[in-house]
């Protein structure tokens, strides 16, 4: 946290894609570029050619939260290498979570100091944005939460074989590995045993850049698997044939598998107690309910949204999230016909700031 001025102990957890970062149609983005709009930052193209944008105002509002002593955390299901590549364009945060909760990193501004857990090869140089204070441009390294890593890398979870040493390079993901990733068939741990079982059934698995999770994408499957993928999604939602030690979440035709102690809600539980160790004793659910806001948009955010005090949805990408918003007064959609994408994100952040301000004045 950049300040401890806030007397109201609150934290904000935010998803990234569809929440802070948006993907306008190519023609709209090109028009913005032609108009030389400097209130938007353009992220590097993804492997599929998509290019996200984040607004300068979004970045300023996130920094305002931190200036008021509110811990701000980015929580994504993306692989760690993807998160590392995008960090220069994202809000500075008090913690960064990748792989659906599997890995936690903290910023370290002492870039020349070697500390336990430092991520080799990652030095983040933040990109400037409109209204950016000079302090936001200071480079930083990342330090992994070794307590969390030690728990999640035991053999009942993900094991230790998925971790690789990284080195920066030019390229689509910005990183290469100094140690080649261990193939799935050589990885120990309950997670990878399940992965091998799914491979035997014909599923194509994506484990590149993941140490504590893997993804199954409908688009990557052979025709016979793709034709019955909806049934597979339903089975996963019902936890059919999912080992007790594992968790899973579905989103936009993908399924992520990870250790049961992982997942977005569980990592939020862990971090809120780390930020506020005395909050509400040891009652995890009350701690999040009383002290956390979240920003999110899709199916793999549902548990996190329900666990927090209030969830704000700048966009809604699934019917289940739309239904959740209609059924719960604590799930608020900020998107309207006139206010979409970055404008809806900015509105959500302003609502959180206003609520915190009211709480502080009581």
Protein language model annotation of sequence segments:
Residues 53-206:
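Active-site phosphate-binding/coordination module
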Residues 23-24, 30, 83-86, 107-108, ...:
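Short glycine-/acidic-enriched loop or helix-start segments at secondary-structure transitions
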Residues 336-359:
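Glycine-rich phosphate-binding/hydrolytic loop that grips phosphoryl groups
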Residues 158-165, 169-179, 183, 187-309:
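Conserved acidic, metal-coordinating active-site core of Asp-based
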Residues 7-12, 16-74, 80-82:
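Active-site neighborhood of HAD-like aspartate-dependent phosphohydrolases
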Residues 16, 36, 91, 300-302:
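Catalytic phosphate/metal-binding cores of nucleic-acid and nucleotide-processing enzymes, i.e., regions
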Residues 76, 268, 291-336:
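Acidic, Mg2+-coordinating phosphoryl-transfer loop and its flanking beta/alpha structural elements
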């Amino acid at each position: 946290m950049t300040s401890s001025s806030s007397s109201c102990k609150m934290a904000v957890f935010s998803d990234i894609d569809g929440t802070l970062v948006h993907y306008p149609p190519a023609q709209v983005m090109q028009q913005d570029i032609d108009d030389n709009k400097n209130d938007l930052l353009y992220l590097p193209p993804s492997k599929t050619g998509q290019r996200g944008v984040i607004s300068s105002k979004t970045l300023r509002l996130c920094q305002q939260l931190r200036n008021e002593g509110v811990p701000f955390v980015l929580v994504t299901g993306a692989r760690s290498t993807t998160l590392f590549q995008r960090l220069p364009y994202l809000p500075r945060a008090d913690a960064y979570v990748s792989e659906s909760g599997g890995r936690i990193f903290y910023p370290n501004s002492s870039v020349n100091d070697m500390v336990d857990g430092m991520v080799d090869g990652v030095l983040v140089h933040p990109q400037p944005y409109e209204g950016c204070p000079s302090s936001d441009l200071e480079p930083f390294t990342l330090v992994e939460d070794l307590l969390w890593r030690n728990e999640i890398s035991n053999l009942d979870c993900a094991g230790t074989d998925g971790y690789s040493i990284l080195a920066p390079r030019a390229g689509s993901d910005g990183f290469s590995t100094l140690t080649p990733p261990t193939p799935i068939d050589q990885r120990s741990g309950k997670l990878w045993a399940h992965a091998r079982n799914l491979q035997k059934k014909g599923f194509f698995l994506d484990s590149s850049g993941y140490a504590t999770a893997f993804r199954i994408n409908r688009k990557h499957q052979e025709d016979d698997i793709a034709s019955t993928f909806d049934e597979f999604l339903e089975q996963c939602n019902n936890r059919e044939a999912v080992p007790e030690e594992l968790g899973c979440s579905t989103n936009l035709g993908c399924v992520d598998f990870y250790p049961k102690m992982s997942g977005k809600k569980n990592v939020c539980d862990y971090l809120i107690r780390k930020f506020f160790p005395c909050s509400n004793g040891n009652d995890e659910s009350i701690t999040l309910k009383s002290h956390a806001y979240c920003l999110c948009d899709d199916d793999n955010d549902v548990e996190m949204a329900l666990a927090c005090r209030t969830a704000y949805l700048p966009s809604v990408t699934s019917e289940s999230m739309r239904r959740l918003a209609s059924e719960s007064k604590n799930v608020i959609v900020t998107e309207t016909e006139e206010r979409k994408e970055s404008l809806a994100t900015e509105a959500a952040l302003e609502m959180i700031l206003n609520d915190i301000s009211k709480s502080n004045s009581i």
